[in-house]
């Protein structure tokens, strides 16, 4: 079994937010109940509702556990049936193929809890918690160290896996440990050193382990008004420099030191360049936005076009930061 990271009642598949999509008319949508839990797995669940690009096909199987026991049961099911597993957080750094994803998609968005230790200044957060919401909550307590993360549109699990960062700060700077779950149900607690952090990556990417929670070291005891004001400054900076009026995945490419990917793309004359409904943003060239009606393959083809143009002009091959899942068709 291979796992891709991307990231109360045991688990739920909300009828209001999960649509079904049958890529193959011979396949029927069905619900699988996992023994010993209230957990149910749904087939042919459309993933566009769960990605920030608002594109993508269906998951062959989809489940959203609400606790560790349900997550373990889901992983056991995948292992027993030799299914590929993809972990889905907020879907904010993800491009899902129009053809969908085979195997089991496990959404961690319902793994939600936060514990503040006011003596040590440490906070333990479940994988499904929203990074921006946490940044505001932490600021209102007067704790410093998380202000920079307010503009990161993801969940804790995904942020830990990719070492998310902004404003010259990143997850590795504040992480104490991450709890991860192996396919056999084994729970491990890993330090930043054991995670092998580097720029926007960790050893968890492409591994067979799922982040369940993380503990961060912050600095309590500051004026909440001051920390909140600093957090607002970080948010405002992102609002004025990055496009939020159309769906996107955030930064598409990693910055190839010493250059900025956005600068290379802009200098290649690609701002505003469009394929189908996908466009290089005018405000920030390292963003590709869905102008409306875009297909995942439009975005994929635009990514490839940008890579070709930048490499031809600058002899630099831009490396995508966005994770692409499924099969795509080059133009």
UniProtKB/Swiss-Prot annotation:
Name used for this protein in its record: UDP-N-acetylenolpyruvoylglucosamine reductase
Gene3D superfamilies: 3.30.465.10, UDP-N-acetylenolpyruvoylglucosamine reductase, C-terminal domain, Uridine Diphospho-n-acetylenolpyruvylglucosamine Reductase, domain 2
Source species taxonomy: Bacteria, Bacillati, Cyanobacteriota, Cyanophyceae, Nostocales
Keyword field contains Oxidoreductase: yes
Organism: Nostoc sp. (strain PCC 7120 / SAG 25.82 / UTEX 2576)
Catalytic activity field: UDP-N-acetyl-alpha-D-muramate + NADP(+) = UDP-N-acetyl-3-O-(1-carboxyvinyl)-alpha-D-glucosamine + NADPH + H(+)
EC code(s) of this entry: 1.3.1.98
Ranges for domain FAD-binding PCMH-type: 54-221
Pathway where this protein functions: Cell wall biogenesis; peptidoglycan biosynthesis
Entries under PANTHER family matching the protein: UDP-N-ACETYLENOLPYRUVOYLGLUCOSAMINE REDUCTASE
Compartments where located: Cytoplasm
General function of this protein: Cell wall formation.
Gene name tied to this protein: murB
Record flagged with keyword Cell cycle: yes
Pfam families, A to Z: FAD_binding_4, MurB_C
PROSITE patterns according to UniProt: FAD_PCMH
MF annotations from Gene Ontology: FAD binding; UDP-N-acetylmuramate dehydrogenase activity
Cofactor: FAD
């Amino acid at each position: 079994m291979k796992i891709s990271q991307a990231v109360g009642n045991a688990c739920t598949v909300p009828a209001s937010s999960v649509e079904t999509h049958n890529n193959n008319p011979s396949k029927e949508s069905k619900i699988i109940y996992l023994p010993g839990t209230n957990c149910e797995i749904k087939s042919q669940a459309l993933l566009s509702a769960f990605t920030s690009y608002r594109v993508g096909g269906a998951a062959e199987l989809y489940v959203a556990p609400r606790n560790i026991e349900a997550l373990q049961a889901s992983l056991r099911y995948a292992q027993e049936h030799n299914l590929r597993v993809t972990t889905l957080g907020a879907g904010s750094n993800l491009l899902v193929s129009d053809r969908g994803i085979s195997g089991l998609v496990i959404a961690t968005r319902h793994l939600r809890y936060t514990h503040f230790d006011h003596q040590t200044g440490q906070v333990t957060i479940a994988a499904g918690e929203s990074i921006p919401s946490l940044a505001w909550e932490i600021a209102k307590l007067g704790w410093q160290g998380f202000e920079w993360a307010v503009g990161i549109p993801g969940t804790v699990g995904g942020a830990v896996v990719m070492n998310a960062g902004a404003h010259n700060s990143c997850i590795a700077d504040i992480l104490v440990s991450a709890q991860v779950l192996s396919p056999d149900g084994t729970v491990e607690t890993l330090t930043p050193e054991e995670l092998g952090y580097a720029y926007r990556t960790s050893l968890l990417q492409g591994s067979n382990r799922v982040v369940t929670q993380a503990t961060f070291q912050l600095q309590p005891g500051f004026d909440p008004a001051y920390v909140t004001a600093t957090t607002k400054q970080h948010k405002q900076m992102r609002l004025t420099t990055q496009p939020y009026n159309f769906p996107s995945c955030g930064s598409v490419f990693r910055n190839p030191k010493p250059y900025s990917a956005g600068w290379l793309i802009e200098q290649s004359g690609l701002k505003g360049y469009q394929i189908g409904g996908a466009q290089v943003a005018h405000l920030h060239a390292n963003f590709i936005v869905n102008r409306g009606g875009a297909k995942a393959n439009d975005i994929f083809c635009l990514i490839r076009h940008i890579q070709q143009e930048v490499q031809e002009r600058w002899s630099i091959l831009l490396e995508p930061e966005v994770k692409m899942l499924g099969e795509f068709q080059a133009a």
